[in-house]
């Protein structure tokens, strides 16, 4: 995956106190470039990219890719651009804020964004961790399910294996013969291996003793197993009898339960028929509600037509009332008070209606609210009557004043009478509309209550459907379980027993590890356990039958509970219907009372209108009433429109309810069908269980027969085991005699080996003495080397002194040579001392050839060292090349006699003078061939060294090698002995397993 580009914020560099902030003026459109350059500066020069270490993880997350952090930058950019524009307009940067403050603000905002990022990162990580935990839990659950499936398969495989084990008992006779052959083979192998295992005689004897003890233990164990098998057989007989009696009792109880269930099924069918009748009643009620809805629609249409007519009449009245408005202004003051009172009354009425709508859900509180409303209405009527009385008093005062005006107004009164007729008609129509609206409001309230009840019923129906579905699922699961029990009845008992045995084994592993050593005991115990397992299987099967019966009882109880719930719901529906009827009666009574009150008010209004015909004040009041009525008409138009919308919405809701009712009817039919299927399935299951009980009884009889056969086979096997044990004992005694003979032969061979070892130890002691002598000689030789080195140093000093004296004596030499030739001969002899000394040494060595080798070695070392070694080495073992170079320096060119030469070869890898650094003498011819490439050299060394015997120098190394080989052999014998012990033990276990 390619890494996304990190999100970097514009953060300018931090300016120190010494830095100066200077900004170059820019154009209005150059803000983006400014931010780009600033970003480059911050990232390149100052190295402050405000990106977190975990930023890549945020950028990779798709949730953060959608987040837009740019609005923060846009705000900063806009603020920067505003500052910049102000600066451009003012044309001086001194008055503006310094850039350092702006940078600090941006830096703070960037830090806030960082913190925000960190918090969001932590939240996302927590969510991811939760998701991962949930996934792990799901995977663990899946794995657990798979493991359970595998365990079930393993259990089935184990059952098959046990069946095969029963067949393998017949083949054990051939296996015992094979065991005998294996014993013979092991004896032959042990005879072959005794040649190798010479040092393990005592251990083999112990093994044979252990085998004898094991055989005795086996004999005792077989006798104990016989007794246990007889006891187990008797226990099995008693248990089978008890199980047979229990099965008979269970059959009787099962038949009784079947009869009870059949009676319950018949009762359930009767209850289902009653439920169908109730559903039919509900359908009739729904049809009635539909008819009522249609009637309401027709009423709304009529109201719309009446409103149109009223609007037309209103237009005519407005044109006529414009002339009367001037005369109506005087009575405005009195009318405003009345209007305010009416508005207060309307507000109180609206509040009461809202309270009623809120309290209609609780039917017990509805009566109290109505009583409060009635009292408030009475109070309002009393207030209105008092106001009317005050107005009458005022009118009486104004009558004296208006008598003069009556003459003028008689003409207008005729016109007003006509107007009043129209107004009366309109008022009647308005009152009718008001009544209709009140009825509509009541109907709406009732509809709301009906909707709420319907919603509650829907919720209850959903709960019932959910419960029915759960019950159906449970019933389906039970059916599947019953089918599974039918199919797994044959293997179920064995599975449960095996699971129990496995659990017992796991619990007793820590305490019974010692008991698992003897495999024969476990095999014989299996025969006893099989008989007990059959009894346990029968018990488990009986328990399963009881559990199935309990499950059936639970299902029946659940069905009864569901039926009771349905009855409760039906009772609730009936109570709700009764409540609706009661509420309708109460509403009708209230409407009648309101109509009577309205009629009484109308009578009073008519009386007042007659009085107003005489008085102008009454005319003015009438005009104002007309205006108010016109306003009310407009409000009524709006209310009618809202009512139309509400009625259309209610129609849609009714249609939806009808659809839901149809769905519920279908669901009820489906539930009936399912119930019938359930009853049929239960009947079939009962029949199948009866058949399975018969099969189980047959299987029990078969099991009894198999137990008897197993007892017979066990007796036969016991007899065969006794014969085989006797044969095994005889064979083991024969093998004992053979092994005793082999052990005696091996003892004699071991005695010979011990004698040889004693001889070798004596030779070893002699060789050790020789080594000690050689070491002493080497120490003496080293001391001689040191003495000779000191002599060489003295000779060097003498040579230096002679070289100094040569210069002084050069002039005297010629005279001395002429005078005394004998002196010259002496000098010549003194110059040629090294060669003469060598010749003398060689003659002495030739004369001493008849001596021992040790004396020759000492003489050769003494003769070689003064001639060859001229330098001192601090290293204990010098290299061969240095020795050869020293020898080449002092080799004389003259001479024709070929003689032997000795060279000391030191061990290169050693830095010490221990016994490992032995001197090895090499012949002169070998060294001369190396130095001169097979050319005939002159007689440069006159020392002859005789060839050493291999015993003198090679015996210590051979002795060391012999010791190491002996140790290696002993280690090998011990490892082979251990491996062979393990093999013997394994073979013995196989023989007796």
UniProtKB/Swiss-Prot annotation:
Biased composition (Polar residues): 831-847
Location of Phosphoserine modifications: 820
Cellular location(s): Nucleus; Chromosome; Chromosome, Centromere
Annotated spans, Required for pH-induced assembly of C-terminal ends into antiparallel tetramers: 694-788
GO CC annotation terms, alphabetical: autosome; central element; chromosome; chromosome, centromeric region; condensed nuclear chromosome; lateral element; male germ cell nucleus; nucleoplasm
Protein role: Major component of the transverse filaments of synaptonemal complexes, formed between homologous chromosomes during meiotic prophase. Required for normal assembly of the central element of the synaptonemal complexes. Required for normal centromere pairing during meiosis. Required for normal meiotic chromosome synapsis during oocyte and spermatocyte development and for normal male and female fertility.
PANTHER family documented for this protein: SYNAPTONEMAL COMPLEX PROTEIN 1
Protein name listed in UniProt: Synaptonemal complex protein 1
Gene (name only): Sycp1
């Amino acid at each position: 995956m390619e890494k996304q580009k990190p999100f970097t914020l514009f953060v300018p560099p931090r300016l120190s106190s010494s830095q100066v902030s200077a900004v170059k003026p820019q154009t209005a459109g150059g803000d983006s470039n400014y931010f780009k350059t600033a970003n480059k500066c911050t990232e390149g020069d100052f190295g402050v990219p405000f990106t977190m270490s975990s930023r890549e993880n945020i950028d990779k997350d798709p949730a953060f890719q959608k987040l837009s952090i740019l609005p923060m930058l846009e705000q900063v950019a806009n603020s920067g651009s505003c500052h910049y524009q102000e600066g451009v307009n003012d044309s001086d940067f001194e008055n503006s804020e310094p850039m350092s403050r702006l940078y600090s603000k941006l830096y703070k905002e960037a830090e806030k964004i960082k913190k925000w990022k960190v918090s969001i990162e932590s939240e996302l990580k927590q969510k991811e961790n939760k998701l991962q935990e949930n996934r792990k839990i799901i995977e663990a659950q899946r794995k657990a399910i798979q493991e359970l499936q595998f365990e079930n398969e393993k259990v089935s495989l184990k059952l098959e294996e046990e069946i095969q084990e029963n067949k393998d008992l017949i083949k054990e006779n051939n296996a015992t013969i094979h065991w005998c052959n294996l014993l013979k083979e092991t004896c032959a192998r042990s005879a072959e291996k005794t040649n190798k295992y010479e040092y393990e005689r005592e251990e083999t004897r112990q093994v044979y003793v252990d085998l004898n003890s094991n055989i005795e233990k086996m004999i005792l164990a077989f006798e104990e197993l016989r007794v246990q098998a007889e006891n187990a057989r008797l226990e099995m007989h008693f248990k089978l009898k008890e199980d047979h009696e229990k099965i008979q009792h269970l059959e009787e109880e099962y038949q009784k339960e079947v009869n009870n269930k059949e009676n319950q099924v018949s009762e359930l069918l009767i209850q289902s028929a009653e439920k169908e009748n109730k559903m039919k009643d509900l359908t009739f009620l729904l049809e009635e509600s539909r008819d009522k809805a249609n009637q309401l629609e027709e009423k709304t249409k009529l109201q719309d037509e009446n409103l149109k007519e009223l609007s037309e009449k209103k237009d005519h009245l407005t044109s006529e009332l414009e002339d009367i408005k001037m005369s109506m202004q005087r009575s405005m003051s009195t009318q405003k008070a009345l209007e305010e009172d009416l508005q207060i009354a309307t507000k109180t009425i609206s509040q009461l209606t809202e309270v009623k709508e809120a309290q209609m859900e609780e039917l017990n509180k509805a009566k109290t609210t109505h009583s409060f409303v009635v009292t408030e209405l009475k109070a309002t009527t009393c207030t209105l009557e008092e106001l009317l009385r005050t107005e009458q008093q005022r009118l009486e005062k104004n009558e004296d004043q208006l008598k003069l005006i009556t003459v003028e107004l008689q003409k207008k009164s005729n016109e007003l009478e006509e107007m009043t007729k129209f107004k009366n008609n309109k008022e009647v129509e308005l009152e009718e509309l008001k009544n209709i609206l009140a009825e509509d409001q009541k109907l709406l309230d009732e509809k709301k209550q009906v909707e709420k009840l319907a919603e509650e019923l829907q919720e209850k129906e959903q709960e019932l459907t959910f419960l029915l579905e759960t019950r159906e699922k449970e019933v389906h699961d039970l059916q599947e379980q019953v089918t599974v029990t039918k199919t797994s009845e044959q293997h179920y008992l064995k599975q449960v027993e095996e699971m129990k045995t496995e659990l017992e084994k796991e619990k007793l592993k820590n305490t019974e590890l010692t008991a698992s050593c003897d495999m024969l005991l476990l095999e014989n115990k299996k025969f006893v356990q099989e008989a007990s397992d059959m009894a346990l299987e029968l018990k488990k099967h009986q328990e399963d039958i009881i559990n199935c019966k309990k499950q059936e009882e639970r299902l029946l109880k659940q069905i009864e509970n569901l039926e009771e719930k349905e009855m409760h719901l039906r009772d609730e529906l009936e109570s709700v219907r009764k409540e609706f009827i009661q509420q309708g009666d109460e509403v009708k009574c209230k409407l009648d009372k309101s109509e009577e009150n309205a009629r009484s008010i109308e009578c009073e209004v008519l009386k007042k209108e007659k009085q107003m015909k005489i008085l102008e004040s009454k005319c003015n009041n009438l005009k104002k009433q007309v205006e108010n009525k016109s306003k009310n008409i407009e409000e009524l138009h709006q209310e009618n429109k809202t009512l139309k919308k509400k009625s259309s919405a209610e129609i849609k809701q009714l249609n939806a309810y009808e659809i839901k009712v149809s769905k519920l009817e279908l669901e009820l039919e489906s539930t009936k069908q399912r119930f019938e299927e359930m009853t049929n399935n239960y009947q079939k299951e009962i029949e199948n269980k009866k058949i399975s009980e018969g099969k189980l009884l047959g299987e029990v009889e078969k099991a009894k027969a198999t137990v008897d056969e197993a007892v017979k086979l066990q007796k036969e096997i016991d007899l065969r085991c006794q014969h085989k044990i006797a044969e095994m004992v005889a064979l083991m005694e024969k093998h004992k005699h053979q092994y005793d003979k082999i052990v005696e032969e091996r003892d004699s061979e071991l005695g010979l080996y011990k004698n040889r070892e004693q001889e070798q130890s004596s030779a070893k002691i002699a060789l050790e003495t020789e080594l000690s002598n050689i070491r002493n000689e080497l120490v003496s030789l080293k001391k001689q080397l040191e003495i000779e080195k000191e002599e060489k140093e003295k000779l060097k000093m003498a040579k230096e002194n002679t070289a100094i004296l040569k210069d002084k004596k050069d002039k005297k030499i010629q005279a001395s040579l002429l005078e005394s030739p004998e002196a010259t001969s002496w000098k010549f002899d003194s110059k040629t001392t090294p060669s003469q000394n060598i010749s003398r040494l060689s003659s002495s060595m030739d004369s001493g050839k008849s001596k021992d080798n040790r004396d020759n070695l000492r003489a050769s070392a003494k003769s070689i060292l003064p001639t060859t070694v001229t330098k001192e080495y601090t290293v204990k073992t010098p290299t061969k090349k240095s020795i050869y170079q020293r020898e080449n320096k002092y080799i004389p060119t003259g001479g024709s006699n070929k003689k032997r030469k000795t060279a000391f070869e030191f061990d290169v890898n050693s830095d010490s003078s221990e016994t490992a650094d032995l001197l090895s003498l090499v012949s002169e011819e070998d060294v001369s061939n190396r130095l001169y490439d097979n050319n005939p050299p002159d007689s440069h060394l006159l020392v002859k060294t005789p060839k050493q015997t291999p015993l003198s120098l090679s015996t210590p190394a051979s002795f060391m090698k012999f010791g190491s080989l002996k140790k290696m052999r002993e280690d090998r014998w011990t490892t082979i002995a251990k491996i062979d012990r393990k093999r013997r033990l394994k073979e013995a276990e196989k023989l007796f397993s």
